[in-house]
């Protein structure tokens, strides 16, 4: 196993103090902690996001759209796994009903897009797969693990008056304008399950030490992210707040009482 290096990302909407076990760089509002993608699995990026207030309403292009726009080879589909939520905290994913592009653009300009979105109340353990093109936003008081395609192409549609660039033309072009499919919402109930099944990556969860069968992974490397607890991987500890590159995890000795996220590209 190899632990991935971390990068602390300063954001205007970040928190003044990171939760345990993260150290907090002084005099910075940290919004994200990134794990540097390893060369062996550079298709995937794992990060923590800590939202102190509502974040921008945004969407991401898919692979074909990103390539057509000259923005690289990858679009961005992602999965959010909620790690902490204050009482009543919400995230927005998808619209209440089908709308047209003109309505979306006007709503983004006047801020009413916030009311057109469905705000889902969340709890730790909830998971939302967010395909490219899905209009989404994170509410205040939410922390989560994001597993995503390794791309940072974001089109902001509305940002609550913050002095950051918006991308209305591109955002409207790539956005899906209907409700979010409920089948893409999941929850880590039980000891094992599949949160995302392609097309770009698969994301499993598994409780180490349980009677549940280990996930059926394809041969090769995987990213292992402890959601809770600490796991020993071939004698080396991996804890909450860390992400490890594990070669052939189905053949590794995983010992401990930990709930793990396990990600692999398709």
How would you name each of these model-derived features?
Residues 46-48, 55, 72, 78-81, ...:
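His/acidic/aromatic-lined binding-pocket segments of jelly-roll/cupin-type domains
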Residues 1-99, 160-181, 203, 263:
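Transition-metal
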Residues 117-129, 232-252:
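Short acidic-glycine-tyrosine-enriched beta hairpin
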Residues 84-124, 129:
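Intrinsically disordered, low-complexity linker/loop segments enriched in Gly/Pro
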Residues 50-54, 64, 74-75, 85-88, ...:
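Ligand-binding loop in jelly-roll beta-barrel domains
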Residues 97-115, 145-185, 264-266:
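Double-stranded beta-helix
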